[in-house]
């Protein structure tokens, strides 16, 4: 089971396809914790991506980290590595959710 609002290490693979994020990085779980699915929806992160209004930024493990809501995706649970490394506070998760809604025009 994954925890909504938790930040995990994820492996997005090494296949280079356009501008999609790849490799190992942190990812924020947005899927509901109560759903026993074989995939989970994540927002990948980056410490080097360009800032944007739809990319909330906050400190994770001592580094300023951007949440790439423009790269949201579902991945197999096997690509989550180990236990969460960070948990977003309620207001931090709300900030990311708001950015997702704005980016998707919801």
What is each residue range found by the language model?
Residues 1-106:
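Conserved functional hotspots at enzyme active or ligand-binding sites that engage polyanionic ligands
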């Amino acid at each position: 089971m994954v925890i909504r609002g938790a930040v995990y290490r994820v492996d997005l693979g090494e296949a280079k396809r356009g501008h999609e994020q790849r490799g190992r990085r942190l990812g924020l779980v947005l899927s509901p914790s109560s759903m026993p699915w074989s995939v989970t929806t994540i927002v990948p992160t980056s410490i080097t991506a360009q800032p944007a209004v739809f990319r909330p930024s906050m400190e994770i493990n001592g580094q300023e980290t951007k949440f790439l809501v423009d790269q949201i995706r579902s991945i197999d649970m096997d690509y989550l590595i180990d236990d969460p490394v960070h948990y977003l506070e309620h207001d931090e998760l709300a900030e990311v959710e708001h950015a997702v809604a704005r980016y998707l025009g919801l």
